[in-house]
Amino acid sequence: MKNTQRHKYKDKEICETRTLTFDPYPYSEIDQVIRLIQDNLTSDLLKGRKSLMYPSDVLTNKYYGHCYHSSQALHYLMDCDILTPMSGEDYRGEKHWWLQDGQKIYDCTAKQYLDRGEHPPYNTGKKTNWYGWKQRPQQISLTLMKRVLDDRLISDIVTKP
């Protein structure tokens, strides 16, 4: 069993905690989990995002805009601690995210490049901390995790101190 928590803060104090409790996937199933993540990427996960450099790409490229929360979801869904968040600047000057285990790359959204005849920016990649205060998981990542977990999800609970 594994817990992933996201705290909400007010005046630097925790005022709410969302906790997903679930049965994580074994590392040996990482390719299957990547496919599950890909199958669950939908445009509603991008609602409210202001940081997309090319918003019209969402209409023609299923994977565009999903690299961060896909990578973060994969990181938390796996039953291991050897996946490193990585990012690099792509051919259009946009940041792209993926995970690595040594030299092995796990990229849920690489097809956004490959389908255009381009290469993901692995050659410019570096270890990168998750965004946000205290590197907490994004709500979008938790929503994607719930979709992927299906019957592996034990609970999704919001508590207040």
Where on the chain are the PLM-derived regions?
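A structural boundary/capping signal
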Residues: 2-161
